[in-house]
């Protein structure tokens, strides 16, 4: 049974999500058994990235009654002669588009969630479908974003990634203020109060109406309607405890990444969601011909020996893991004091959030040096992730268990 399930998603296709998910899962498998599950079922992206024979895939799980653990494909010895990635396996999507597998309903989705929860691995990485729909949202955690991937070269995907954050957080708030929630029973006149909360959430979500721009404005209106009420504190704490983790792909320097990817991402989050959330940059992957060539050969860059170096070289993550964990400890989100619920800013102000992200990006870049090897990038990303997995609560990074629809 997995200790942690981590989805990797993106607002749009073309940002290298599957490349990041595949190599991250491979790198993580050096430290603990890891299974990559291809939930981008319309394109079978993982199968296209790892060109090894697949005996059983999600088709056999849904149509032929195979258990999901029977659909795990391992690397052949010829691909991993030294057994460096013996802890890695993947579940491929179907070879061709099959409607009931690509657009599975609630019953099949619940069955798949249950099966993922029982996979024989410490870590399960989900390569999600690009974009945002029910077959994405239902596999995402409730209290954090999993890993979001975006790139300086596709601005529309950066903005769409912030929409994923909004969708997860609003789903969490609606669960908190639903009749089945424990909080519901603690509120005086719960039906009237939760109706008010959900009506105001509708206003924030409706981008076509010039109503409430974000959850901070939502708190202002809620305070005007309820006064000093425990609901305000519950909303504020739910937002504050939400964690956003992201990776920059096709990285080409701090200035470009910040101006064309990080800045619009943060500004959109602050203006349409809230400035109370905690953001964590897990690292980046440089733009690399090796990655492109590996994708063309259907052999991930971590499995392709670089020119002049053996494929079985010790990874930087293995040689320097303790040092990297000490290093990343100083790059975690600053322990800011809890914000008072009131007064709430009446106008979005992203500058403090932008300053924190730029400072973290600069410190990461200068501490790591100008490394242009994607292997080093994945080692670093993995070390950052392991640091979180060892220290953070399961609700802060990925999830311990999929709940399903």
Question: Which functions belong to the PLM regions below?
Answer:
Residues 39-118, 122, 191-199, 243-245, ...:
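P-loop/Walker-type NTP enzyme "switch/lid" segment
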Residues 182-405:
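C-terminal lobe/tail of nucleotide-utilizing enzymes
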Residues 101, 128, 132-139:
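Conserved ATPase-coupling elements of RecA-like P-loop NTPase cores
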Residues 2-41:
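Walker A/P-loop phosphate-binding motif and the immediately C-terminal alpha-helix
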């Amino acid at each position: 049974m997995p200790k942690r399930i981590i989805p990797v998603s993106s607002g749009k296709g073309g940002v290298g999500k599957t490349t990041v998910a595949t190599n991250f899962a491979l790198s993580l498998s050096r430290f603990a058994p890891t299974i990559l599950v291809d939930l981008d079922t319309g394109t079978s992206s993982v199968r296209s990235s790892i060109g090894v024979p697949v005996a059983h895939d999600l088709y056999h799980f849904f149509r032929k009654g195979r258990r999901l653990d029977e659909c795990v494909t391992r690397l052949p010895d010829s691909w991993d002669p030294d057994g460096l990635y013996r802890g890695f396996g993947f579940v491929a999507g179907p070879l061709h588009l099959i409607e009931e597998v690509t657009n599975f309903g609630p019953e099949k989705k619940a069955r798949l969630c249950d099966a993922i929860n029982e996979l024989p691995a410490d870590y399960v990485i989900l390569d999600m479908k690009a974009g945002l729909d029910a077959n994405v949202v239902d596999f995402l955690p409730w209290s954090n974003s999993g890993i979001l991937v975006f790139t300086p070269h596709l601005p529309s995907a950066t903005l769409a990634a912030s929409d994923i954050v909004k969708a997860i957080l609003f789903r969490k708030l609606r669960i908190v203020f639903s009749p089945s929630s424990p909080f519901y029973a603690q509120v005086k006149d719960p039906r009237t109060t939760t109706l008010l909360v959900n009506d105001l959430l509708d206003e924030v979500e409706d981008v076509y109406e010039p109503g409430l721009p974000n959850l901070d404005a939502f708190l202002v209106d809620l305070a005007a309607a309820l006064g000093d009420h425990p609901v305000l504190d519950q909303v504020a704490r739910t937002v504050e405890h939400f964690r956003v983790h992201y990776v920059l792909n096709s990285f080409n320097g701090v200035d470009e990444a910040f101006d064309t990817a990080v800045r619009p991402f943060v500004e959109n989050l602050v203006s349409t969601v809230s400035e109370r959330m905690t953001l964590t940059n897990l690292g980046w992957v440089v733009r690399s011909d090796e990655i492109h060539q590996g994708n063309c050969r259907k052999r991930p860059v971590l499995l392709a020996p670089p020119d002049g170096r053996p494929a079985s070289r010790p990874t930087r993550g293995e040689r320097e893991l303790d040092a990297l964990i000490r290093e990343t400890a100083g790059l975690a989100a600053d322990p800011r004091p809890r914000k008072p619920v009131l007064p709430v800013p009446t106008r979005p102000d992203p500058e403090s959030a932008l300053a924190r992200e730029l400072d973290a990006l600069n410190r990461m870049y200068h501490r790591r040096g100008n490394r242009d090897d994607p292997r080093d990038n994945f080692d670093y990303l993995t070390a950052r992730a392991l640091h979180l997995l060892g220290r953070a609560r399961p609700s802060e990074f990925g999830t311990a268990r999929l709940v399903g629809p």
